């Protein structure tokens, strides 16, 4: 994710640091996570538990209804107190604020989700740290190349009792 100004932290790098420091990553009081998938939910929930963090906002350009995250992940983030800032597209980070452009829902796209259309409205969110959790993909091609059956989301198919994949041995 590129902003006009300011830097973001990568979600997977944050999660690794969170684990390595037992939740003591230096993030400041206000954290903003950008994204709407499972990685964004995990990142927001971890940030909420991180030492010194008071508020975690999750920014997404559509509404919760169109987030690709599993419903269970979304519910857990809500239960943990993550605040959702819907219909916002991040533009830049400056002076401790993430500047976002307000969006509105448009027509349905090929994936069945509503597209978004920019408006002229600007929204500012307090942000000491911005973590980008966009574009994280499960390496489905790797699984398939190694003979592991995958589901429609390119996740390995496993036996629910043994957690074995389709590969013998």
Q: Where are the predicted features?
A:
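Short amphipathic alpha-helical segments
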Residues: 1-3, 44-46, 70-71, 142-146
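Short, hinge-like loop/turn segments at secondary-structure boundaries
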Residues: 5, 73-76, 102
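FAD-site-proximal beta/loop scaffold in flavoenzymes
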Residues: 6-28, 108-169
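General small-molecule cofactor/ligand-binding pocket signal
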Residues: 9, 83-85, 99
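Rossmann-like dinucleotide-binding cores of NAD(P)H-dependent redox enzymes
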Residues: 16, 44-92
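Rossmann-like NAD(P)H-binding beta-loop-alpha module
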Residues: 22-53
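Short, glycine-/Ser/Thr-/acidic-enriched flexible segments
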Residues: 38-39, 63-64, 91, 103-105, ...
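A conserved short coil-to-beta-strand element within the FAD-binding core of flavoproteins
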Residues: 87-97, 102-107
